Structures are given as structure tokens and as C-alpha cells.
Amino acid sequence: GKGLRTAKDTKRGQKMDGITIRTAVPADLDAVVQVEAACFPAAEAADRKSLKERLDVFPQSFLVAEDGNRIIGFINGAVTNERTIGDEMFEDTSLHEPQGAYQSIFGLDVIEEYRHRGVASRLMKAMIERARSQGRRGLILTCKDRLIGYYETFGYVNMGISKSVHGGAVWYDMILEF
């Protein structure tokens, strides 16, 4: 009908230009490692072992963006009762608290040729939606100063310079509370 969205249209809307967002599975490891290496300098990139542990320990908070069968981006993070991310959380998956109040974002990666097409936004929105549906209080992340404004568009608030010295960079603590 005119101006009425059918169920088929809505479903296609989630796909948008052939790109889908889904929960990661262990078989995604190789592709995820490649995306991480392409998106972050070596000092900041999570290594294969860390990414494998994250896939194993918190698959429910590890989402991938796929174009056809190609993984082009992902978002992941542990769940915690802390309101900020400590550097130890990046390395130690035992700090994941499945019933925790806050969904952290350890990484939001999109390969270069797919940037500026809304893929990162869709990954973030999917993670926010998942955190909300799981009854979390909100989400937390750390970012560099140039990305503060970007994350504010999702409702995150800047809490100032983080204690994190991950990769030798200056990070800012951001929080989104429901």
C-alpha cells in the first residue's frame, strides 16, 4: 500500500544494502582478527588470544557486521558493575560479570572501505538495543578525544580523562545510562 511498510520492507530495512548485523560465532575468529589488525595500531589492537577468549566468554555481547559472507566490522565488550573500563578488563575475561549493570564496549571496528556508510552506527545501536533488552543500566566505553562528539550522538556523556593508558594513548571515559 501507499506509505505503508510491509513486513518484507521492514526486514529489508535491517539488512540495508546487503549488510547484516548478527551475533558472532567461534568460526568468525580469523575474520575478526584481520578486521582488528586493520583498524587499530599494534599497541592498541586486541590479539588473537584475547579475541578468541571474548568470543568464547561473552558471545552475546560480540556482534559482527557482514556484507554477504564477509565480516566488515564488529563490536564487543564484557559486562561489568563498574562505571568505567579499567585496562585489566581488556585482558582478563574472568572480569566479565554476566549479570552486571553495564555493557562495556572494548572495540567498535569497521574496515576502511566500509566507513562513512553507517555501519558503525548500526553496530552501536544494535549493542545499545541488546543491553537495554538484557536489563542493563547502560553502556560504557573509552575513546580518544576526536571521537567524543561521535559517541555523544548516541547519548553517551563524557566523564573526563580515563585512568586507562591502553596502548600509551589518552582516553576519555564515556557512559550512556538508560
Task: List the model feature ranges, each with a label.
Residues 137, 144-145, 164-178:
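C-terminal "cap" of GNAT-fold acetyltransferases
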Residues 152-162:
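Conserved acetyl-CoA-binding loop of GNAT-fold acetyltransferases
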Residues 7-16, 128:
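Short, low-complexity, charge-dense intrinsically disordered segments
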